[in-house]
A protein has these predicted regions:
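Short amphipathic alpha-helix adjacent to the substrate-entry channel of hydrolases
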Residues: 67-89, 96-98
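Alpha/beta-hydrolase active-site loop
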Residues: 103-138
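Short beta-strand element of the alpha/beta-hydrolase
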Residues: 48-61
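Primarily recognizes the serine-hydrolase "nucleophile elbow" in alpha/beta-hydrolase
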Residues: 129-203
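N-terminal cap/lid segment of alpha/beta-hydrolase-fold proteins
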Residues: 19-49
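Bacterial Sec-dependent N-terminal signal peptides
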Residues: 1-22
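The feature captures the conserved acid-bearing segment of alpha/beta-hydrolase catalytic domains
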Residues: 172-245
C-alpha cells in the first residue's frame, strides 16, 4: 500500500509542463537524423549537490519507441523537479522490420541480429555523448558527471555502453580520452555478447539494476548457446560484478515480469538513494535486495514476451 500511495502522490504532483526543453540534432545517419531532447532542472534553493545529468535511452525491443514516449515524461519531470537535467536521445531501431524466431534452429541467428542492433544503438548513443562533451559549456553539462539510464532495449544499450567505454572498443573511440560514465541505471536490462561472459578492462561505474525475476522479454538470468548469449541482471551480479568487487545495487522483484522496465516512478526511492549515495556520495555500498511487494504496481504490458514483440 505504501508504494502505491507514493506513486499516486508523485503522479498527482507531477504535471507535464517542463521549465525548459530544447532539441538538438546530434548526428546524421544513412537512414535518419539523430536528435536529443534536453530537459532543464528546476532550481532548488540552497542545493549544493553536484547532481549528474541523466542520459536516457528509450526501450521498445529495437523495433519501436521514441525519445519522448508519453509514458516516460512524468519520470523526466520528477527528475527535473529534484534538480536533475535529463537528456533523452535517439538511436536507430536495428530490428525494425526484421523477422525474429526463437526456436532451436534460429536462436543463434536471432542472437546475432540482436547483438547487431545493440551495437548500432551503442554507436548512436556514443554520438550523443560526444555531442554533450563537445557542447558541455553551453548545455551546462559536466562530461565527467553523466549517468546513463535505459528501459528494456535502452537498458541493454546502456549496460553495453558502459562495458564498451571501459574496454575502449572501436565504437568507443569517438568518446574523449578518459571518458567514463558516473553511473548506470538499468531498468530490465542485459548485455548481449558473442564472446562469452562480459568482462571489464577497467573498473565500471556504480550500477543500479532493477529487474523482475520472471521477465520473459529481457532475461533476468542468462539465455544463450556457446559464447553467444543475453546476460541478464542477476547473472551479471552473481558472475561479473560481485566476484570482482565492483559497486552495484540490484533490486530483484519476485514474480514481476517485464513491467519493471517501466516502473521508474514507483522505484524513485531506490533511484534517489543510488544517485545521492553511490554516484554523488561515492559510497561503495553494495545492495542486493529481493523484494516481494504486493503494492508494487503491475503495468499493462507485464506479460510481454519475445514472441509478442517480434
Amino acid at each position: 500500500m505504501k508504494r502505491s500511495i507514493l506513486l499516486l502522490a508523485l503522479l498527482l504532483c507531477t504535471t507535464l509542463s517542463f521549465a525548459q526543453k530544447a532539441t538538438y540534432k546530434v548526428a546524421q545517419r544513412d537512414t535518419c537524423d539523430l536528435f536529443m531532447d534536453v530537459y532543464e532542472p528546476v532550481a532548488i534553493p540552497g542545493d549544493t549537490l553536484d547532481r549528474p545529468t541523466i542520459l536516457f535511452v528509450f526501450g521498445g525491443g529495437f523495433v519501436m519507441g521514441q525519445r519522448d514516449d508519453p509514458w516516460v515524461l512524468p519520470w523526466f519531470k520528477l527528475l527535473n523537479e529534484n534538480g536533475y537535467r535529463v537528456v533523452s536521445v535517439d538511436y536507430r531501431l536495428g530490428l525494425k522490420g526484421v523477422r525474429m524466431k526463437f526456436d532451436l534452429f534460429h536462436l543463434l541467428q536471432s542472437a546475432d541480429l540482436t547483438k547487431k542492433a545493440v551495437d548500432m544503438g551503442v554507436e548512436d548513443v556514443f554520438a550523443s555523448v560526444r555531442y554533450l562533451c563537445d557542447h558541455a559549456e553551453e548545455l551546462g553539462v559536466d562530461p565527467d558527471n553523466i549517468v546513463i539510464s535505459g528501459s528494456s532495449a535502452g537498458a541493454m544499450i546502456s549496460l553495453s555502453s558502459e562495458l564498451e567505454a571501459c574496454n575502449r572498443t572501436v565504437r568507443a573511440e569517438i568518446l574523449p580520452a578518459g571518458f567514463h560514465f558516473a553511473g548506470v541505471m538499468s531498468f530490465a536490462g542485459a548485455i548481449m555478447s558473442d564472446s562469452g561472459k562480459p568482462a571489464y578492462k577497467r573498473s565500471p561505474c556504480p550500477q543500479l539494476l532493477i529487474h523482475g525475476t520472471a521477465d520473459e522479454a529481457v532475461q533476468y538470468e542468462k539465455m544463450g548457446f556457446g559464447r553467444r548469449g543475453m546476460f541478464g541482471s542477476s547473472y551479471l551480479v552473481n558472475n561479473v560484478l560481485k566476484p570482482a568487487g565492483y559497486t552495484y545495487q540490484i533490486y530483484r522483484y519476485v514474480g514481476h515480469t517485464h513491467d519493471m522496465a517501466a516502473n521508474m516512478m514507483a522505484n524513485w526511492p531506490e533511484e534517489k538513494r543510488f544517485l545521492e549515495e553511490a554516484v554523488m556520495g561515492g559510497n561503495k555500498l553494495v545492495i542486493d535486495c529481493t523484494i516481494d511487494d504486493p503494492t508494487m504496481p503491475v503495468l499493462g504490458f507485464a506479460s510481454v514476451t519475445l514472441d509478442d514483440i517480434y
